[in-house]
Amino acid sequence: MDLFHTPAGALDKLVAHNLHPAPEFTAAVRGALGSLNITLQQHRARGSQRPRVIRIAKGGAYARGTALRGGTDVELVIFLDCFQSFGDQKTCHSETLGAMRMLLESWGGHPGPGLTFEFSQSKASRILQFRLASADGEHWIDVSLVPAFDVLGQPRSGVKPTPNVYSSLLSSHCQAGEYSACFTEPRKNFVNTRPAKLKNLILLVKHWYHQVQTRAVRATLPPSYALELLTIFAWEQGCGKDSFSLAQGLRTVLALIQHSKYLCIFWTENYGFEDPAVGEFLRRQLKRPRPVILDPADPTWDVGNGTAWRWDVLAQEAESSFSQQCFKQASGVLVQPWEGPGLPRAGILDLGHPIYQGPNQALEDNKGHLAVQSKERSQKPSNSAPGFPEAATKIPAMPNPSANKTRKIRKKAAHPKTVQEAALDSISSHVRITQSTASSHMPPDRSSISTAGSRMSPDLSQIPSKDLDCFIQDHLRPSPQFQQQVKQAIDAILCCLREKSVYKVLRVSKGGSFGRGTDLRGSCDVELVIFYKTLGDFKGQKPHQAEILRDMQAQLRHWCQNPVPGLSLQFIEQKPNALQLQLASTDLSNRVDLSVLPAFDAVGPLKSGTKPQPQVYSSLLSSGCQAGEHAACFAELRRNFINTCPPKLKSLMLLVKHWYRQVVTRYKGGEAAGDAPPPAYALELLTIFAWEQGCGEQKFSLAEGLRTILRLIQQHQSLCIYWTVNYSVQDPAIRAHLLCQLRKARPLVLDPADPTWNVGQGDWKLLAQEAAALGSQVCLQSGDGTLVPPWDVTPALLHQTLAEDLDKFISEFLQPNRHFLTQVKRAVDTICSFLKENCFRNSTIKVLKVVKGGSSAKGTALQGRSDADLVVFLSCFRQFSEQGSHRAEIISEIQAHLEACQQMHSFDVKFEVSKRKNPRVLSFTLTSQTLLDQSVDFDVLPAFDALGQLRSGSRPDPRVYTDLIHSCSNAGEFSTCFTELQRDFITSRPTKLKSLIRLVKYWYQQCNKTIKGKGSLPPQHGLELLTVYAWEQGGQNPQFNMAEGFRTVLELIVQYRQLCVYWTINYSAEDKTIGDFLKMQLRKPRPVILDPADPTGNLGHNARWDLLAKEATVYASALCCVDRDGNPIKPWPVKAAV
């Protein structure tokens, strides 16, 4: 759509549908840049001679949030430890850039789904450039890799750089903007914290600029970043509101471009006149030929550069644009630009009226002209300084009558002043004029230079993970003063409605995020639920609600004429079942959306910790209501459910909701052409679910919690979450309703107070894309730059999963990632070969073989963290009893070679050798580079090669076991010697049986979390064997019913006192020694589960089977073990003893 042919009223639509980047491409780019970030960070660790990457910052239009659809740019600034000063950046570049280019060539082979990679011609020395483009070529982003000196260090929210940063910059004798990359983060934050609508205006201005570029191809136009700053200046001086007319804003920016030869703009957000060297430099900069637009992060960079750029071409284009359709209102009248200090005014040819902020801030240069910077660090000031010689006023500014009147009043009582005092007096009077003039645009207690953006919190993605607690406290928690005012207003409203209503009020309840204690700074919601006697049941609410609401509105309209001091109140768009109001602080920095809802008192007053009567919910379900139609009736239960959460969990909720708000605000009116996203309340519940299942501690890592929730959001199509704290599946009506809900499409997030309300409904796609993008950012990195892991949480719970869905549950949540398993297999093969070839090379000891064991080798590993063994069989062990000798020396030798292997080979997975000083155990971990929760922990175990080279399907020589029996003093002492047999016993089983083993192991791990601290559970391997036994005795059907198999294993666990399970696949009673030993083992107290590879290993002995049996009894009646009619699934007919 052409800008000039778009009516003024349709500009928002033009921006939303034509200028915002395509969400699919944005998501793909974020994923690619996150992957590249990790690649660059890891590059530092390989080879100690290479410069270390301290951190990586993103800049450019992409990072500032001002990227246009089609093509845009991003800077990846790589801060290296080899740069100790600005000057160092000119050296040690060719080798560094060469290494990075090789890295890029490798990475660029697979930059990400739907993207192509191509190197570009670098526009400057000391940088690398390439382009990522969509497959169809319609969307692209130019990426610049810029190595830089980390002069600022780890950025801290709201902290200004120290003056010596800029004085050292100036003393480096750099060219203008030569080291601007060092200041990427403050530059990005300056723009990024602005309101969404202002960024839309920036997109509109840049779109106009690109149209000019196509017509003026030979002209050297100023960079588009200059127009971003000019747009911010125009908004700060003329508007300052979050909501405004795009046509009026565009008209103002073009008017400034038309008057560009008078422009002199700078900010003191990051630097100022306090330091003598910086102050003197700024004075010189402000005398440069107009336009002057100083970069707010780097004072050496005059982005406006009147001597270099053809602003005159832009000025001509701007002047010719004013009569276009985009500036015409529906009535045909042209929109007018904003008015304010430093902006064009009717009848004035220049911008000759400087901004002054206060009498104590005047700074005089050697010609007596004044320039001023703001003293308020919390604001983002812009300064128009045309009072220098090159921009002397040509036509006096139009006199302001109010200003003259002020001056006359002051002169009556004035004493004679020096020239300097007179100048200060002039400034002081001008301040009052500026503030009163701007009052039509801004709250009265904010100066004309403050912005809505200055109230916005910093970009979450750039907050270091260790600072998240402080970030929440400083930026997300609501103002206590405003909360107190709101409480007073609510009490007054309730008092008004109680006293004057013609209907009897039974009681009231406060809900919404304000009532739940999860309200964010800036804006939140409150539900005032008023229970009336006349509303006697669910069905009877609708007929009376309309008249009650009319009565409420009449009372409140009278009351709102004198609301609580410091607050304003207004009625907003109404809903059929509620009265909608908005309370706002007088400075408009905080607001509350208030819903007043008349409701039926279904629950009645409840004592703490008690459940509503089951008939409450059965009557709700029988009322034929719509989903969540009567949610207000359960407001107290909803509030109490969240109010009991620990304080840190509520902090995590605030962080998640802040991220949610950033995402929704960013895309509001943009691509959001589909369904609305789920409500923020859904993310509160998701946060509680994540914490309950993955942590449960009072103290925890906010970054780990946030990553867990973002991961669940990405898995939204599998979410199935509900609680039974208020309603129970034991009630037939509720059970039937829940079963019906559970058969619906995901996501399912049931309100814990109202089972009819699935709060998970909505479009999660955008949230999922943004969650993936945030995953590689600073906020989710640990101090050493590695990504923090998520908690171990699945999107659905086993006991809440329908029996018919167990196969799907296993495939989605329990099966490990196949690609990761392949990577692990390759890595383990490399490690095994390396150990076999290199260990004990200069010794008589030989590595006979290396065998893989554990769940990973058996094919029963779970998704997430699993275990495995590497058993190294050595020639120095000639019998069982020798296995413990020289263990420390052997472990030390293997460890040295493992570490060498780690250095010499490149792996697809992250390879970490444990540094534990344990002479018995050597461990290492293989972790996925992309799936943070996927890893395998290996134990390296030296062992005696008792079995030798066994042929497949053959039995060991009986002498192996007689020697074992004579040598063994502790049960299972030499089980590592039989790793191959243990592995083969499971690997030979059908795939579906391995799936059942996974299910049983997952259940066991969940029980372990619940039982933690109460006692030692049986070993997990024992449950694997019990599962095989259940299947063998239950018919050995390779395609069995998963719920029946699971139910059978649970039943055997309940009967643990009768368990006696063993196999004679590898050993038998035919040999007298073995036979006598087996009889002795089988006479031991139950349960007995003998290892089929090692008869000395009784896996049922000395464990708290009673605790496991209790959990098995609970699960036997859960949804995963009942059929569609709610009847318990029957187990297979299996005896507890062979």
Curated annotation (Swiss-Prot):
Region of interest (Interaction with dsRNA), ranges: 12-56, 185-199
GO CC annotation, single: plasma membrane
Keyword terms of this UniProt record: Acetylation, Antiviral defense, ATP-binding, Cytoplasm, Immunity, Innate immunity, Magnesium, Metal-binding, Nucleotide-binding, Nucleotidyltransferase, Nucleus, Repeat, RNA-binding, Transferase
The protein's Enzyme Commission number: 2.7.7.84
CDD domains with a match to the protein in the record: NT_2-5OAS_ClassI-CCAase
Modified residues (N-acetylmethionine): 1
Enzyme class: transferase
Cofactor names: Mg(2+)
Binding-site positions, ATP: 855, 998, 1001, 1020
Ligand binding (Mg(2+)): 867, 869, 939
Reported regulation of activity: Produced as a latent enzyme which is activated by dsRNA generated during the course of viral infection. Strongly activated by long dsRNAs at least 50 nucleotides in length. ssRNA does not activate the enzyme.
Compositionally skewed regions (Polar residues) per UniProt: 447-459
Location, primary (coarse class): cytoplasm
Residue stretches spanning the membrane: none
PANTHER family reported for this sequence: 2'-5'-OLIGOADENYLATE SYNTHASE-LIKE PROTEIN 2, 2-5 OLIGOADENYLATE SYNTHETASE
Function recorded in the entry: Interferon-induced, dsRNA-activated antiviral enzyme which plays a critical role in cellular innate antiviral response. In addition, it may also play a role in other cellular processes such as apoptosis, cell growth, differentiation and gene regulation. Synthesizes preferentially dimers of 2'-5'-oligoadenylates (2-5A) from ATP which then bind to the inactive monomeric form of ribonuclease L (RNase L) leading to its dimerization and subsequent activation.
Family: Belongs to the 2-5A synthase family.
Protein's recorded name: 2'-5'-oligoadenylate synthase 3
Gene (name only): Oas3
